[in-house]
A protein has these predicted regions:
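Juxtamembrane transmembrane-helix boundary signature
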Residues: 61-95, 104-120, 447-459
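Transmembrane alpha-helical segments of multi-pass small-molecule transport proteins
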Residues: 104, 133-163, 177-187, 212-228, ...
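C-terminal membrane-solvent junction of multi-pass transporters and transport-like membrane proteins
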Residues: 366-447, 463-468
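Membrane-interface "cap" regions at the ends of multi-pass membrane proteins
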Residues: 1-58, 187, 207-217, 236-241, ...
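Hydrophobic, membrane-embedded alpha-helices of multi-pass small-molecule transporters
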Residues: 25-41, 187-194, 203-266, 285-304, ...
């Protein structure tokens, strides 16, 4: 029986060779911007609009998004760009050659959650578009169509991704125009309703102004922290760090607060973050149809990138390394389809809690990776050791797990929950001054540095012995 052939380079989790990393700055920016500009921005804007006015909300959200994106770039960027690996593979030096399963599970849950949300949003918008065009009558029939449209969307994404990273880039080239349509919608509501927009007051604002501002920043941080699962699979295609940094900050980060202003403005003035509802009021039925077409198409770019990143992440599992790309795509898409078919309304209603839970997990993870790469390893990694396991290997630690990373992740998550309950949004007295994500990242970093120093002294984890390094420098001089 013939052995299955090795997967194509961009369909594997192996490090990409320089000749395989062909995405320039323009192509990477376009792909990242299309990925970022999904309709979740409206829901993010709606969440911020519950606590802050338009100007304050825009400033807080933008600041939070850039802070979160910087954490993600510092955490996953160096290893992913240097060696052409994905986000999951980049955690092996911290968690071990078995412990990386923990970040892999976090990646899968996050991407499944986001993609489910976007597919449900697509199905709902497609139903509204059909009603607006007179193709169907409004009523309960729309709810029955949501599962069918979910299956259709998953089939289209599956077909596009049969071509690997090329499929992601192709979808981005087609859908990039929707970013400008989104900016046009923002211009419409701002230009038509500016006096009302400035005078509008948020409905859920707390008496403490500081709490409201901090929550706006926290929502921005949590939003861009959710890019950690995606970023590695995209920037590994770039030839070097100089090519990747600006596209990440301007292409993957900036569109999120900009397009979130659509939802922020809509919920403040017209009590709805969905542009397809308020554009009918602003510009009539024609504008509403244009908006629905935009909303329907916008989510494909993000969902395609998410499915691709998740499928590449699955390649890190030894049992799936030789499986066909088609099999991996099906494994990745099936959970998304099941959520969209069986529990769309329940999942859609829990978006705020899902967004907070992302910050709980990924803020500590970023703190761990930044500390390990810049402080403990001093930017030295062994890429070969990431793909070999067993006793005596550099990243084997103890049984393939690094207890320092697991303890630090637990400490970071506990810090977040102590400061802000992600489900009820009840907070401690320190939260308005600190946020929750930043202390979670800092506490995880501190615990990891202290315990990681002990791991290094024990001679585990492939760290350079600090005393030996000093002797080597002295001998060299």
């Amino acid at each position: 029986m013939a052995e299955p052939s090795a997967p194509a380079a961009d369909e594997s989790a192996w490090p990409l060779l320089p000749s395989e990393r062909t995405w320039g700055a323009a192509r990477l920016t376009l792909t990242l911007a299309t990925t970022a500009a999904a309709t979740w921005c409206y829901l993010i804007g709606e969440s911020v609009g519950g606590y802050l006015g338009f100007v304050q909300g825009a400033m807080a959200l933008t600041a939070g998004c850039f802070v979160g994106m910087l954490l993600v770039l510092l955490a996953a960027g160096p290893a992913c760009v240097r060696f052409g690996i994905d986000s999951v593979a980049a955690t092996k030096p911290q968690f071990g050659t078995r412990g990386w399963v923990v970040p892999a599970v976090l990646q899968a849950v996050s991407i499944i959650g986001w993609n489910s949300l976007l597919i449900i949003f697509f199905a709902k918008s497609a139903v509204q578009l059909g009603v607006a065009l007179g193709l169907m009558a409004p009523g309960t029939a729309g709810a029955a169509l949501v599962p069918l449209l979910t299956i259709l969307a998953c089939a289209v994404i599956f077909t596009a991704l049969r071509r690997g990273a090329t499929g992601v880039s192709l979808v981005s080239n087609i859908l990039f125009v929707h970013v400008f349509v989104g900016l046009w919608m923002l211009y419409l509501i701002v230009s038509h309703r500016w006096p009302e927009l400035i005078a509008a007051r948020p409905a859920l604002a707390a008496p403490e102004r500081g709490w409201n501002h901090t929550t706006g920043v926290e929502l921005g941080i949590g939003t861009t922290l959710s890019w950690w699962p995606y970023i590695g699979a995209m920037i590994r295609m770039a030839p070097n760090g100089r090519t990747a940094v600006l596209p990440v900050m301007l292409g993957m980060c900036l569109p999120v607060p900009l397009l979130s202003l659509i939802g922020l403005a809509g919920v403040l003035v017209l009590k709805s973050s969905d542009p397809s509802e308020w554009l009918r009021t602003v510009g009539g039925p024609t504008y509403a149809v244009v908006s629905l077409g935009f909303v329907t198409a916008a989510n494909f770019g993000t969902t395609t990138a998410g499915i691709y990143a998740s499928a590449v992440g699955l390649r890190n599992f030894q049992a799936l390394q030789r499986r066909s790309w088609t099999t991996l795509l099906l494994v990745t898409i099936m959970p998304v389809a099941c959520v969209g078919i069986f529990i769309p309304e329940l999942f859609f209603a829990k978006f705020g809690s899902f967004l907070a839970l992302i910050g709980v997990a990924f803020a500590p993870l970023c703190g761990i990776q930044i500390t390990d790469y810049f402080l403990l390893r001093r930017r030295r990694l062994d890429v070969r050791a990431m793909y070999t396991q067993g006793p005596g290997q550099p990243y084997w630690f103890w049984g393939g797990f690094n207890p320092a990373a697991l303890a630090a992740l637990t400490a970071g998550c506990a810090t977040y929950v102590l400061l802000l309950d992600p489900l009820s949004y009840r907070s401690s007295a320190w939260y308005p001054y600190l946020t929750a994500s930043l202390p979670a990242a800092a506490s995880a970093a501190l615990v990891y540095f202290l315990l990681g120093s002990l791991v290094r002294r024990a001679g585990r984890g492939g760290y350079r012995n600090p005393r030996r390094a000093r002797h080597e420098r002295q001998d060299a001089t």
